[in-house]
Amino acid sequence: MALALPIIQTIGAIVDKLPAGTRRLKVLSLAHPDLLMSVDQIPRVFPHHDPEKIQPRADSADVRKRHGLPESTGDLPDTRSLFDAIGCDITIVDVVEAGDVDRIVDLNEPLDPDYREAFDLVLDPGTVEHCFNIGQTIRNAATSVAADGFVLHANPMSMFNHGFYNLNPTLFYDFYNQNGFEIHLIAAMTGPAAARKFVDVPAVKRFRNAPPEARMVSVARRVEVREIGWPTQTKYGGKSG
């Protein structure tokens, strides 16, 4: 799983919106997210934080190759040290011990109660599409978000056989809009690994010619804590609220 530069920039903007105070922010990531950026880009992306606290990955060359980044990208930042430097404690879960994982969980099933409303930011770096019980997996992400916290998804929209599913904008728009969240971003992300960019797509209206190999990126904020239910598609009368 990986987070491209536009998503990392979005995370920086989210962290700036969350109350800093004296409390460190709590982040949950559904699988370990490789960060597809150079350590040299850190001061521009996180100008209010000390880049000296962020360690480069010893396996940067292998990660660059795996994700199609050019060698000129240089060293990539270590995920934990970056989140630590920006004032966040990150918890990483996965179904297997793949890389740096804190806890083994099966996201096809409901998470344990200690996850409920426990995190300021929940990250899905491209995981829910690999879970067959995808509705429950997205519900797990939503229920883990604390009041006024955020959830970010980055999943395939037109990446065939990447996972079990390609996802449409209306999925996240309807699910979060109907469950006490406020939508902050709905976009496609496309382009080569070193130059990905957001592209506008309609949230609920039918459209054609989706960008090839595109990801669906959504950000929502939990403005009202309630039981998470199953949405009705806007096309068939689903209402916000």
Model-derived features: where do they sit?
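Short, glycine/serine-rich, charged loops/turns that create anion-binding
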Residues: 34-35, 97, 158, 224
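Class I SAM-dependent methyltransferase Rossmann-like catalytic core
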Residues: 1-29, 34-47
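Residue-level detector of flexible, active-site-proximal loop/helix-junction positions
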Residues: 34, 97-99, 109, 188-193
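Aromatic- and Gly/Pro-rich amphipathic surface segment
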Residues: 35-91
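S-adenosyl-L-methionine-dependent methyltransferase catalytic module, highlighting the catalytic core
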Residues: 67-73, 84-86, 132-241
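A short acidic (Asp/Glu
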Residues: 39-42, 102-103, 163-165
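Conserved SAM-binding loop
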Residues: 27, 74-161
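A structural signal for well-ordered alpha-helical segments within the folded catalytic domains
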Residues: 5, 9-12, 77-80, 139, ...
